[in-house]
């Protein structure tokens, strides 16, 4: 049998590896990093979203679930057990918003963008995309990018470029965006400039 505490050690290692991947993704916008998927994720919960939520959320970080996730009670049960985080119905109160697919992403105006004094009191939106293929291709610039970086993902909302430009204009306020696809993750922090590639 495994030694006592081995399960907790495995859990801690998974969380540490995913946390490191997320920090690398935030530091290098548009770069794909690998997540470690936790066990027992409900079928209705995209695995990448679960990995990010379990790693970043705790009892002090309210979570908001989109309609599809909220309609599957096992998702909220899993999150409460794995994180202790409260589930909120008001998106403006959320520290993290979990969106089952990027095309269903609500307007950023639903969420807190922080304040000039406390820009960190804003939301991080975590959403799932189907692919990193060139359904929508963009050029990224900003902190963590030496010159420009090509980034593609899809499908995305039709107004995605406009949303990101409006969000960047709020800096240092604004939302941070994390995209997952299976066990892969990309981050687009609020400091990132995004424009559609020619």
Question: Each PLM stretch: what is its role?
Answer:
Residues 68, 73-198:
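Internal, well-folded beta-alpha domain core
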């Amino acid at each position: 049998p495994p030694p006592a505490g081995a399960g907790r050690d495995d859990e801690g290692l998974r969380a540490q590896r995913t946390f490191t991947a997320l920090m690398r993704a935030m530091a290098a916008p548009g770069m794909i990093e690998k997540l470690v998927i936790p066990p027992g994720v409900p079928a209705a919960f995209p695995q990448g979203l679960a990995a990010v939520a379990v790693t970043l959320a705790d009892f002090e970080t309210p979570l908001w679930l989109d309609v599809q996730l909220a309609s599957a009670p096992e998702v909220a049960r899993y999150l409460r057990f794995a994180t202790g985080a409260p589930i909120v119905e008001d998106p403006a109160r959320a520290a993290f918003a979990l969106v089952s697919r990027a095309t269903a992403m609500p307007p950023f105006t639903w969420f807190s963008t922080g304040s000039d004094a406390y820009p960190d009191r804003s939301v991080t939106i975590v959403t799932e995309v189907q692919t990193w293929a060139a359904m929508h291709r963009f050029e990224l610039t900003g902190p963590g990018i030496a010159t420009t970086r090509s980034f593609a993902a899809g499908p995305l909302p039709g107004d995605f470029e406009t949303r990101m430009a409006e969000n960047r204009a709020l800096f240092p306020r604004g939302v941070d965006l994390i995209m997952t696809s299976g066990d892969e993750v990309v981050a687009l922090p609020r400091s990132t400039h995004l424009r559609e590639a020619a």
